């Protein structure tokens, strides 16, 4: 495979998740309402992960070499320390922690924080840096985005594909793997008409429908909040299916609108936060 084809191959994956989940509010009033922090709402996983107006913070960490010099008792106690911190903030943020050690060069673990109020996520991450493991790790990458309601592949604009997306439910085993890919579009994309972008999204969504039973996906918008436009988040138990998804999208020409795809692409495994820290303490 040539360098160019490899590049095109990588740039094409996010078409589906952007096609199926790229969103913006339909009016300024709706946008303002969607973005209002819902401070009075209790954090419930099944709710916050399906709502618009939710901020997502992804922070990748690399443990320092001196971590191995920390006394074993302190390293073992770090898991309980992080568990207590998560419990302290459970009414303000939803915390997921993933293990990347052994799969990535530049990180050992990363957080995904979902919050109605971005400042609450910032407070959690600031306090994490004061924990035993937080004081012995350096930030490699931070990505910030927000969820929005469907815009392109919606019932009114693309009813056929919307029905296909709605009926394609994940049916595989509990996902063991997580992949995070940041994406940035070029000026040509943003200067296209909404109708032109809709057409592109329909073309790119079609070949992905067969893989939605194997791959979960979620989209965060980050234009103006970060140096990228989208954060694409995937969960799967079948990395071969995920690879085949990429191969199917390699034939789609939408990658000409990307100026960033990955850099980094982060692959990790899914565990409880406590188990991630325990694994790093060994």
Curated annotation (Swiss-Prot):
Q: One Gene Ontology cellular component annotation?
A: periplasmic space
Principal place of residence: periplasm
User: Where is this chain's protein located in or outside the cell?
Assistant: Periplasm
- Write out the catalytic residues in the record: 217
List the Gene3D superfamilies: 3.30.70.3420
The alphabetical list of record keywords is: Calcium, Heme, Iron, Metal-binding, Oxidoreductase, Periplasm, Signal
User: EC?
Assistant: 1.13.11.49
UniProt-annotated binding residues for heme? 204
Q: Sorted alphabetically, which InterPro entries does this protein's record hold?
A: ChdC/CLD, Dimeric_a/b-barrel
Q: Does the keyword RNA-binding apply?
A: no
Give the residues the record marks as binding Ca(2+). 104, 226, 265
Q: Mind telling me which Pfam families this protein's record contains?
A: Chlor_dismutase
Any one GO MF term held by the record is: heme binding
Catalytic activity of the protein: chloride + O2 = chlorite
UniProt feature coiled coil, ranges: none
Could you say which enzyme class this protein belongs to?
A: oxidoreductase
Per its UniProt entry, which superkingdom is the organism in?
Bacteria
Give cofactor(s), names only. heme b
What this protein is reported to do is described as:
Catalyzes the heme-dependent decomposition of chlorite to O(2) and chloride with high efficiency and specificity. Used to detoxify chlorite, a by-product of the reduction of perchlorate, a primarily anthropogenic pollutant, in perchlorate-respiring bacteria.
Summary of subunit composition and partner proteins: Homopentamer.
Family per UniProt?
A: Belongs to the chlorite dismutase family.
The protein depicted here goes by the name: Chlorite dismutase
The organism encoding this protein is: Dechloromonas aromatica (strain RCB)
């Amino acid at each position: 495979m040539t360098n160019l084809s490899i590049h095109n191959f990588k740039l094409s994956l996010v078409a589906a998740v952007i096609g199926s989940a790229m969103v913006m509010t339909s009016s300024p009033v709706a946008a303002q309402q969607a973005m209002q922090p819902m401070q009075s709402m209790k954090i419930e996983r099944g709710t916050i992960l399906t709502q618009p107006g939710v901020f997502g913070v992804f922070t990748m960490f690399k443990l320092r070499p001196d971590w191995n010099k920390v006394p074993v008792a302190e390293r073992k106690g770090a898991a309980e320390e992080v568990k207590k911190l998560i419990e302290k903030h459970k009414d303000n943020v939803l915390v997921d922690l993933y293990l990347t050690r052994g799969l990535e060069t530049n990180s050992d673990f990363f957080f995904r924080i979902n919050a109605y109020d971005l400042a609450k996520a910032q407070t959690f991450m600031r306090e994490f840096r004061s924990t035993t493991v937080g004081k012995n790790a350096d930030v490699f990458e931070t990505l910030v985005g927000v969820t929005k309601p469907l815009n392109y592949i919606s019932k009114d604009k693309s009813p056929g594909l919307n029905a296909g997306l709605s009926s394609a439910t994940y049916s595989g085993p509990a996902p063991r793997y997580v992949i995070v890919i940041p994406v940035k579009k070029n000026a040509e994309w943003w200067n296209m008409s909404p109708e032109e972008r809709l057409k592109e999204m329909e073309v790119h969504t079609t070949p992905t429908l067969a893989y939605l039973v194997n791959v979960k996906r979620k989209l965060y918008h980050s234009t103006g909040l970060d140096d990228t436009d989208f954060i694409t988040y995937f969960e799967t138990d079948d990395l071969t299916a995920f690879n085949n998804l990429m191969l199917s999208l390699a034939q789609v020409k939408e990658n000409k609108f990307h100026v960033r795809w990955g850099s980094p692409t982060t692959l990790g495994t899914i565990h409880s936060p406590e188990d991630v820290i325990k694994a790093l303490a060994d």
